[in-house]
Amino acid sequence: MKSMKRWAPALAVSTVIAVGSFAIPLQASAVDLPDLTPQQVMLLMDREITGFSGTIVKTSDLGLPALEMSSMMSKDMVKEMEEKMPDGFDEFIPNLIEQNAITQAVELISGTHKIRVYASEVGMRVQVLDRMSQRDVIVNENEMWTYDAKNAIATTAKFEDKISAADKTKIEADAKASFQEYAAKLQLDISNPEAVADYLMKMIGETTNVSVGKEHRIAGRSAYQLIAKPKAQNSLIDSVYVSVDSETGMALDVKVYSIEQENPAFQVGFESISFATPDASLFTFTPPAGTTLQTLEMPAELEAELATLKKEYEAKYASKEITESDFAAKKAELEAKYADQPKPEMIGEGWESVIYLPAIPKEVPMEMLENELFADLLTQVPGGKVFSTPVANVLITDTGNVYAGAVTIEFLQQVATR
């Protein structure tokens, strides 16, 4: 992990977004920075960061109610889901419901939370600071931990199969060569950051209006503001505001606005931040006394299958390049293996792209959709039912098809009838 820059903004936005999303109000003190174009702000974001720590405030206004999964799942529904799980995952569904993990995930996406983040080249630690408790995720080169202080449960997984330095160098070299080959086809000089920024702006500009907003302060730091406004008429997204640290180029704050409401639907941003490298001890964890310890272990059948695949790969491809025909053969093999599973398709592109599923995955019991609590989340529309939020809609048609996207309900209905 030579460059933290490649994943630091994703940690502050993506990790925390899969964990929720947000921003903080702009601070009143005036900021006077040199004027930059959108391309120049993007170049600023290419700077390398080796470590940081800070407190993120996460809020979202999605209109999601509090859900208690245990009250939504009958014993028969749980049993049905168990039977459909792969061998070795028999206890997965009961444990998930007993620990209320799904409820916690939904609750984390909605509402407001404070999240403490530590990151460096040797690890990452995320602490969700609840009112009466705390949840931690710790990742280093050797292991991963999650800790729920409220329920006194710790879960760990070891990273046993490490990539050797030689293999890592080869992977990086192959990736760089592939990228350079692709760039050559585009007639793009990837050694020229300005050229890359211009190319990205040209691509983005086909679907999005991008501009630079007011200079301001976030977490005590001066920042530029990139504003993206979709050109698509059927998008639920009105605009996205990204605050970029004027010195480090790190994304400090993100706001996502919906056409459905005035307040941001998603906000994720730093309340405080330091770019000093956190102490390595923060990326280790010892469960407190009295903690229930769980170890994530791969089911024996799956582990054996992966071991077989590894041997096949080493025997077949270790001494030669993988060709397109090799990929085609593997694709055909996987398609045959999962032929009975509904396959997602992408309809359209850009801000109006829609994911289509010909059926609800068989692992989801249909009785769950008829549960009173779950049914309250669905709105009846001509041709089906819709689960709606300010930034995404999911249409389940009367015939069992599923359409989902960050688009209006009317647009989903149009796509469904094409």
Regions found by a protein language model. Give the residues of each.
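Beta-turn initiation residues at beta-strand->coil junctions
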Residues: 58, 128-130, 149, 230, ...
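Intrinsically disordered, low-complexity segments enriched in Gly and acidic/Ser/Thr residues
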Residues: 307-387
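Gly/Pro-enriched, hydrophobic low-complexity segments
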Residues: 205-290
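Surface-exposed, charged, gly/pro-rich loop-and-adjacent secondary-structure segments at domain edges
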Residues: 208, 276-315, 332-340
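N-terminal leader/targeting segments and the immediate start of mature chains
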Residues: 1-123, 133, 166-169, 179-197, ...
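Short, surface-exposed coil-to-beta transition loops
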Residues: 112, 132-134, 235-240, 264-266, ...
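Short, solvent-exposed coil/turn segments at beta-strand boundaries
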Residues: 118-124, 139-144, 221, 244-250, ...
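Single conserved position on a long alpha-helix in the C-terminal lobe of the eukaryotic protein kinase
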Residues: 129-154, 162, 238-242
